């Protein structure tokens, strides 16, 4: 049987400008979790926008992947929700996402309904990534 690893995915790219980075980060993190690994997904900087409903639900408007239908947006959203529901850990940079008017008081209005969010800072970024065997950065 395969050895379990700790994976750390760091998304800082703006999903509206680099949708491929956002989608690949989600699909790779989901796959690592499905294969039985421990997986942390840390969104920071412009990457925090991936959790915004209006952004993830409209990825298909900024990428040719998925043929321009909303299927690719739905796949990304569902993958992230499933990732969260099945034990994937999601961190969001609290300072970064505040730039977009989202905070711990109003996030339920703005973000997709992931099971749990860790509101984090550079301290947690370093602590969590230092536990990883493998780091992906998008």
Where are these regions (language model features)?
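Extreme N-terminal starter segment of soluble prokaryotic enzymes
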Residues: 3-8
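Short, glycine-rich nucleotide/cofactor-binding loops
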Residues: 9-22, 45, 51
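Short, basic, glycine/proline-bearing loop/turn elements
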Residues: 11-15, 60-68, 106-112
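Histidine-anchored nucleotide/phosphate-binding helix
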Residues: 21-35, 41
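Short internal beta-strands
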Residues: 39-45, 90-94
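N-terminal beta-loop-helix "entrance" segment that forms/cooperates
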Residues: 47-60
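A glycine-rich helix N-cap at a beta->alpha junction
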Residues: 59-95
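A short aromatic-anchored loop/beta-hairpin motif
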Residues: 79, 83-87, 91, 98-129
């Amino acid at each position: 049987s395969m050895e379990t690893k700790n994976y750390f995915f760091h998304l800082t790219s703006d999903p509206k400008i680099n949708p491929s980075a956002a989608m690949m980060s989600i699909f790779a993190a989901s796959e690592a979790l499905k294969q039985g690994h421990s997986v942390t997904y840390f969104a920071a900087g412009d990457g925090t926008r991936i959790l915004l409903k209006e952004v993830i639900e409209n990825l298909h408007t900024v990428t040719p992947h998925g043929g321009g239908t909303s299927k690719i947006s739905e796949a990304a959203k569902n993958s992230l929700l499933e990732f969260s529901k099945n034990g994937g850990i999601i961190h969001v940079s609290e300072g970064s996402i505040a730039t977009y008017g989202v905070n711990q008081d109003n996030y339920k209005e703005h973000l997709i309904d992931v099971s749990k969010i860790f509101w984090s800072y550079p301290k947690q970024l370093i602590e969590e990534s230092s536990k990883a065997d493998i780091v992906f950065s998008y």
